[in-house]
Amino acid sequence: IPLTEISWSPWIWVLGAWAGFRCHGRQCAIGDYYRNIHMYFLLGKDKAELDSQAKIKEEMNSMKWMSKDWFHKLYLYFYARYTGSQEAQVKSFHKMMQRLEEKYGDNIPADIRENFCRESRPLMPLTNIINFDTRVAVLFLSIGFGIPWFYFVFESTILEAVRFYVTGRHERLCERIMEQYTD
């Protein structure tokens, strides 16, 4: 580490890159998306921030790079990639939404929305764990105890396990809702 007497193997950079680019990005994206899905069913389409990559790309493609909107177009480019990474992790959710929209349009019945929220509510604290609070606490503690490499291990193991658990439970919830209300 620069300006300290600590020296690490070059492998710390590999571990850090893996934890940051592969694990952290997916964890935050899915935690954010699950909260937006929950808010969609709780508050409705107009009050939730449940965007689709296709709609973002459509808006982005309607703009020109050489215009006053170039910065917004650049923002939409990265936001579309982020939203695409979210959508790629929730295939059952998108199948469920497609079937619900085919059957009910934009008016998903209250009992379906309430059932979905009731079953997804226990997952919301876990989305907080994979988003910010827990990871910041572990980062500061690992630095404070002089073992900063522990944060990368924690990110790559514990938080990945939480992400897999939350994703599995949420995808099974979507499959149950799909079977119960769209067949």
What is each model feature region?
Residues 23-24, 33-183:
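C-terminal membrane-associated helical module and adjoining short loops/tails
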Residues 1-28, 139:
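Multi-pass membrane catalytic core of lipid/isoprenoid biosynthesis enzymes
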